[in-house]
Every structure is written in structure tokens, then in C-alpha cells.
Design a protein with these regions (language model features):
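Terminal amphipathic alpha-helical/low-complexity segments used for targeting or macromolecular assembly
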Residues: 1-105, 117, 166, 171, ...
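Structural signal for interior beta-strand "rungs" in well-ordered beta-sheet cores
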Residues: 40, 101-310, 315
Length: 356
């Protein structure tokens, strides 16, 4: 695709500095851009523009006034990120589905209910009493087990499994190989054998939730495991049975949440956070990468480390730990001085006794 810079200025309502007939063929980040690219910089004042990029054109904040080398055409906008996303969308139009409607190579149970404009790809399997909302898209290899429901305009990518009686809301995205509603990891070991405990609950995923590839969300024992509206879940996240995840949480890659954890709204868990069972995480809390959370977390708290503690406390511990070798040397030196002083004192006391 080839687009004139003047057309991009019109698209973004930006101010153009430079050649309006400049031809742009692609969008690129600063470090990989070439003479066919348009790129962007949200903080251009931090860059040396003689070396920052080989792009032909740059999207910059409207407030930025420093002149760039003449080789750059410039597009000045109010919101750099939003403008560049609009330009990128122009160069990367969505591909049309390779299938439309219900493939005759998909299995759809006679008792299933399909909304208008549903797309079901070959080799998908739709079980008894399943309900699929209007405009939903199910790719190849998807399995929706009996009694489950998929909301309107939800996209389910290949090889996703939604177990029986689970509910997926509208406008959700389920990426490849995620599993919704597997049995929770609960066992009765009183007999000496590990006997699977009751797993009669379900999973309820509210609207506008995104679930990453290979993520797993277990069904509740008697009630539903709940994922709140607008929550975004990264790849390889594991959420155990009976959890209640609030609205608009961000759960980054490889987070593991044990059973019956409750989170408030707008909680952020960075990569590889681990949360023990039956804890409460308050709204707006941030759990730093690889935090091992062993106690309840208040709303708005920022915690890090293993075991996780408030960020400032953990930083003090890390500073002290970094100084530990030096501190050990000082302690050894002080101990040696003390021993020498005590020896001298003993010698003086012995001499004084002899004189008496």
C-alpha cells in the first residue's frame, strides 16, 4: 500500500510539516524504520534526531517545536499514540475470515442455538444446548461443550475448549488453546487416595474480557469462578477454582492464582506473580513481577518480592542486602577490635591484681 502524507494528515487531523506528496508505504518503530516508513515518538526531546531513525516521516506531539533535520517530513498531532494507531490500522486492514456462516465440516448439535451472522469454522464442535450469540466467530478446532454459552461478537481462536455450562460474555476474545472450565485442583485425601472433590460449579466470564493463549480458568466447586468485565488476561495465566476476579484487572504472563482468591477492580499483577489461596486483593493494588503473595493486600497497595511486602519496605531490604558483604566485614572488624580490647582489659586487671 502507498499513501500520501497529506492523506495521513487528513486521517489524523494533524499539521503537516514538509512535503505533502511524500509517499509512505508502511508503519515502523523508530529503530527499524527506513525511507518508506512513517514512525512516531511520544517524547521526541529525548532523542538525537541525527541518529534516532531512518524513517521518511515522523508523528510528533503538536507541542514539540524543535526543528528536525530536513530529511524528515513531520505530522504533528494532539495524541501521538492514537494517531499512529489509526495510521497503522490503515496499513494493516483486517483479513476477511476464511470462512463465513457455519461450515458443513463443523459439528453443531441439533439443540444448539445460533444467533445471526455466526461464523463457525471447519472441525469446530458445538455441543447440546449451547447458545452462540450474534456475530460470534469460532475458529477451527474450537470445542464448546454442552450447556455453555458464547456472547455476541466474541471471537474464539483455534483449539479453545469451553467446558459444560460455562458462560462467555459479549465482545470477548479467547486466544488459541485456552481452556475455560476444567475441573478445579481439589482432592479429598482422607482415605489415603486422592479423590477428586465436587466440581459442580462453572465459569462466568463477563463482557469485554480478553484471555491469552494457553491460559486456564478452572470451574468452581459449587459456585462459579468469575472473571469481571473488561479484565485482560495474558498468556499462560492460571486461575484456580472459586476465584472472583474484579473488573478491568490486568493479569500478565504466567500469573498463578490459587483457589478462592478475590480481587477488586483495576488490580494489576505483573509477570509470574503467585497468589496463595483464599486471599483478598484490594482494588487498584499492583503486584510486582514474581511477587509471592502470602497475605491480603489493601486497596491501592504496591507490593513486590518473595514473600511480597510493600514496595518501599522491599526496596529498603534490597539496599540492605546489597550492603551485607560490606556490613559483614565491618562486623568482623568490630568483633576483632572488641576481642583485642577485652584481652587488653583482662591483662590490665591481671597486672593490677599481682601488684596488690
Amino acid at each position: 500500500m502507498k499513501v500520501l502524507l497529506s492523506q495521513l494528515a487528513e486521517l489524523t487531523q494533524g499539521d503537516l510539516v514538509g512535503d505533502p506528496n511524500c509517499v509512505i508505504e508502511k508503519t515502523s518503530p523508530l529503530h527499524t524504520a527506513d525511507s518508506r516508513s512513517i514512525t512516531f515518538a511520544e517524547k521526541p526531546e529525548k532523542l538525537d534526531w541525527n541518529f534516532a531513525t531512518n524513517a521518511r516521516a515522523v508523528v510528533l506531539p503538536r507541542s514539540y517545536e524543535i526543528r528536525l533535520p530536513e530529511r524528515f517530513a513531520i505530522l504533528k498531532v494532539d495524541d501521538v499514540k492514537t494517531a499512529f494507531e489509526a495510521i497503522a490500522a490503515l496499513f494493516h486492514p483486517k483479513r476477511a475470515l476464511s470462512h463465513s456462516g457455519v461450515s458443513d465440516r463443523a459439528y453443531v448439535a441439533a439443540s444448539a442455538t445460533l444467533g445471526a451472522n455466526v461464523s463457525i469454522a471447519p472441525f469446530a464442535s458445538i455441543g447440546d444446548d449451547v447458545v452462540i450469540g450474534d456475530g460470534a466467530v469460532l475458529h477451527s478446532g474450537v470445542t464448546i461443550m454442552p450447556g455453555a454459552s458464547i456472547g455476541a461478537n466474541t471471537v474464539v481462536f483455534p483449539n479453545v475448549v469451553v467446558y459444560e455450562n460455562c458462560s462467555i460474555g459479549a465482545n470477548c476474545i479467547l486466544h488459541a488453546n485456552c481452556v475455560i472450565g476444567a475441573y478445579g485442583f481439589g482432592y479429598d485425601s482422607s482415605s489415603g487416595e486422592h479423590i477428586l472433590a465436587a466440581q459442580y460449579g462453572s465459569v462466568v466470564i463477563e463482557d469485554n474480557v480478553e484471555i491469552g493463549a494457553c491460559a486456564t480458568i478452572d470451574r468452581g466447586a459449587y459456585d462459579a469462578t468469575l472473571i469481571g468485565e473488561g479484565t485482560k488476561i495474558d498468556n499462560h495465566v492460571m486461575i484456580a477454582h472459586n476465584c472472583k476476579i474484579g473488573k478491568r484487572n490486568l493479569l500478565c504472563a504466567s500469573v498463578g492464582i490459587a483457589g478462592s482468591v478475590t480481587t477488586g477492580d483495576y488490580v494489576v499483577m505483573a509477570g509470574r506473580v503467585g497468589v496463595r489461596d483464599h486471599l483478598q486483593i484490594g482494588s487498584g493494588a499492583t503486584l510486582g513481577a514474581m511477587a509471592g503473595v502470602m497475605t491480603n493486600v489493601p486497596s491501592g497497595a504496591r507490593i513486590v518480592g518473595i514473600p511480597a511486602t510493600p514496595e518501599k519496605e522491599q526496596m529498603r531490604k534490597q539496599v540492605a542486602l546489597a550492603k551485607l558483604p560490606e556490613t559483614q566485614k565491618e562486623v568482623r572488624a568490630l568483633k576483632k577490635e572488641l576481642e583485642q580490647a577485652l584481652a587488653r582489659l583482662d591483662a590490665l586487671e591481671g597486672k593490677s591484681g599481682d601488684e596488690r
